[in-house]
Amino acid sequence: MEEKGEISPSGVVTVKGDEALVPRTEFQQNPSFLQFVSPTTVVTPLPPPPAPSSAPVPTTVTPGSATASTGSDPTKKKRGRPRKYAPDGSLNPRFLRPTLSPTPISSSIPLSGDYQWKRGKAQQQHQPLEFVKKSHKFEYGSPAPTPPLPGLSCYVGANFTTHQFTVNGGEDVTMKVMPYSQQGSRAICILSATGSISNVTLGQPTNAGGTLTYEGRFEILSLSGSFMPTENGGTKGRAGGMSISLAGPNGNIFGGGLAGMLIAAGPVQVVMGSFIVMHQAEQNQKKKPRVMEAFAPPQPQAPPQLQQQQPPTFTITTVNSTSPSVNTVEEQKPQAYGGGIVRPMAQMPSSFQNDNSTMNNFTPAYHGYGNMNTGTTHKEEHEDEDGGDDDDDSGDTRSQSHSG
């Protein structure tokens, strides 16, 4: 069925066919809006979404028109990025990620023993004690020494150091080892030796204490020994020795404790170690207890402002209830050049320097720097002068009387 739409001169759009059922739109109510629309184009806006109903809604498309009629075509291709969520709020199937169903561990990897991949709190509570891992704590400093086992004098091996040296042919192996044992207070032990020997002196394991000397070329099978430091009554020494096993040219094996020289027939390589005996290490670690001197806590002092505000205190001893106390500096001493006595010098307290009433009653002592009877001498001189004048006057009177 062919459908056409026409525009009348009055601006009313005429729709034929099924479009007559569609209600009038804004374009029909406002004819002036259609002046911008091409006369050959019919624009039909989408109506509001109809109420859901069981009957399907027919959709028609007008050929030659730019927009479809009511309803949406799900097969129509749209431009732009597709929406992640559908209008109903569900996730777009394109954005769904395939979920993998993991295979249970029990079916993929068989467990053996008490080992498990996951360790939850509930599982840790039921685990035996031997499977619980404990955190390791690193303690700085030397650990506390443990007492030796019964039958052992002390533990050895503290600060163990290895040494290696080579003895040339014609040299004594024993003389090369002894200097190491004499250095410091370290103990040494011979671990191994390889080479050949030309001369060796061994001790006899008898009560006579004889020695046997072997000359030739012998291979060293083993060389061992130790030298431990000892101290007896303040005298330090060494205790120990070495033993050796040798093989002769015909395959004979002999050996024993060294009782003399051990001359090398060729290069002999010796490996030994030095260490500190445990009881010596303990003695070195013991330190004198630190003596802390006890000091009396300082007494709190008043601030300088309070010290200035406190009134000064004085101790006054009255003499004759009127004069203040006099502090003598030194006792009476005769003057070095004669002529009197040096009287003690009086010092007046500072509190009485501005007291007029006290000063009136206080008679300072004079410092004697000569004859203390100077006042009397001056009086006698004045009296002599006055007497001389009297004599002169009397002489004049007599002369006048004689002249008269």
Curated annotation (Swiss-Prot):
Residues 76-88 bind DNA. Transmembrane segments: none annotated. It comes from the Eukaryota. It holds the Pfam family PCC. Coiled coil: none annotated. One of its GO terms (molecular function) is minor groove of adenine-thymine-rich DNA binding. Residues 56-70, 98-112 have a biased composition (Low complexity). Residues 40-112, 365-404 are annotated as: Disordered. A motif (Bipartite nuclear localization signal) lies at residues 76-84. Residues 45-55 have a biased composition (Pro residues). This is AT-hook motif nuclear-localized protein 6. It comes from Arabidopsis thaliana (Mouse-ear cress). The gene is AHL6.
